[in-house]
Amino acid sequence: MALGNSFDLTINQGETFNLTVTWTDSSGSPINLTGYTARLQVRETYSSTATVVSLTSGAGITLGGAAGTIAIVIAASTTAALTAPFSGVYDLELVNGSVVTRLLQGAAVVTPEVSR
């Protein structure tokens, strides 16, 4: 996956959200994420101070080292507590020392749950 990709997220209220992506270089080889940390935040708008969802390495995000994978999980109990319908923005950043790379960004939409 190239840097700075725009990719919209649809989060279903009350459902476990799972997304796994692989960060690759221009030749398609995975980038080794050993030593990296990650963070993902969802906000109502870019300028909002409050976060709707906030994940970090070890707390919703798991990095796959040499495989270059980034697994994002939002628990069903967390998505159930989200206001729906909702439309906001998010980004996913990888941090290696003092270098921050925005890997993904886009709209984050929460669809309402019907079954309870």
Regions found by a protein language model. Give the residues of each.
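Contiguous segments within soluble domain cores/interaction surfaces
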Residues: 1-116
